[in-house]
Amino acid sequence: DPNATIIMLGTGTGIAPFR
């Protein structure tokens, strides 16, 4: 799931852009 990478980036920035 490519979203997994975005989720990792989201947690690092404190947001969830995958939404």
Curated annotation (Swiss-Prot):
Keyword tags: Chloroplast, Electron transport, FAD, Flavoprotein, Membrane, NADP, Oxidoreductase, Photosynthesis, Plastid, Thylakoid, Transport
Pathway(s) per entry: Energy metabolism; photosynthesis
Binding locations of FAD: 13
GO biological process, one term: photosynthesis
Entry EC number(s): 1.18.1.2
Domain of life: Eukaryota
Single GO molecular function: ferredoxin-NADP+ reductase activity
Cofactor: FAD
GO cellular component, one term: chloroplast stroma
Positions annotated to bind NADP(+): 13
Sequence intervals crossing the membrane: none
Enzyme class: oxidoreductase
Cell location: Plastid, Chloroplast stroma; Plastid, Chloroplast thylakoid membrane
Catalytic reaction annotation: 2 reduced [2Fe-2S]-[ferredoxin] + NADP(+) + H(+) = 2 oxidized [2Fe-2S]-[ferredoxin] + NADPH
Membrane-related topology note: Peripheral membrane protein
Role this protein plays: May play a key role in regulating the relative amounts of cyclic and non-cyclic electron flow to meet the demands of the plant for ATP and reducing power.
Family: Belongs to the ferredoxin--NADP reductase type 1 family.
Protein name: Ferredoxin--NADP reductase, chloroplastic
Originating organism: Populus euphratica
